[in-house]
Amino acid sequence: MKIVTTKDNLQILHEDNHLIVVNKRVGDIAQGDNSGDKPLPDIVKEYLKEKYNKPGDVFLGVVHRLDRPTTGIVVFAKTSKALTRMNDLFSSRETQKTYWAVVKNKPPKEEDTLVHYIKRNQQNNTSKAHLKEVPESKKASLHYKIINELDNYFALEIELHTGRHHQIRAQL
């Protein structure tokens, strides 16, 4: 695999006629917010517009997002048909998303499935995990496995069964 880095430090991991896959860096935002920072889709659109010398607006569909303090692979659709197909794959759970996280302090078990009820606080953009259902909470489930450790830090491989707001951060 050849990684292409643009003048804006956009790292392109894959591109074809239908999709463009990029590495989202820590601090990049996957969609616009009130911070005034330029969202990753706008940077990708500028790249496509320049590369293909396209006048006017460039279509770019956001297939999925990652939180600002997270790095990882983000997939964008270059056509509406590709976006529909990718959305169908994600909603029918035909895709597999693997996450890696570093946590301080060892989890109780080497490998486990966690089930909580997550309540989102819109005002401060946080989520809190509860052991029992609380009003306006949503059930959240994930499976983790410790894959490495150093001092009191542990690298986990995580598979989400649900996709809740800040789920990994809230549950672990």
Model-predicted regions and their roles:
Residues M1-L172:
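RNA pseudouridine synthases
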